[in-house]
Amino acid sequence: MESTASIVNVVRITYRLPEVKILFNKYLFLFITSSTLIVIDQYTKFMVTLHIPINYSIKVVEGFFNFTHIRNSGVAFGIFSNQNSELKPYLLIFVSIIAIIAILVIFHQTGKNKKIVQTGLVLVFSGAIGNLIDRVLHKEVIDFIDFFIDNQHWPAFNIADSCITIGVMFMIADMFVGDGSSKVSDNTLMK
């Protein structure tokens, strides 16, 4: 009886190995990609802090693109930056942590065939962590990428913001075009 039970356990474990490998690869992708993007984000912010005084610009492309050291105590596009409260930085840190947890839960629940969504979530996760690090260290986010035409400036942003924006674009793209997995299953059902 014991040998039969151990064979059944080996079969169960062997059956689950592909699932474990897929899950491992999914989280390995999250770890490697997000670690790389977070390091790049923090390195660029460190270099800006080291070499560009606050509210000072370095021209990169005349009349179009500068590196401008700006501190944003609010959220995207400087929203809430004029709100003065001692609790604001802590509230934004708390909201960031909740958002990061939600992203991880959604990432975990995302199917193995939803590579576009997984990539989008990894990008958003990376950006959220990058900006959270700023909020914890500085109580504000360091922005420096400044595009403009004449005196019309797009709000300054950073690598983390770019990750969030591109990640959201990936998820929206998946809603419209998908990655083909649902189309394959629909065609299979029709046959």
What residue ranges belong to the model's regions?
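Alpha-helical transmembrane bundles and membrane-interface segments of multipass inner-membrane proteins
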Residues: E2-K191
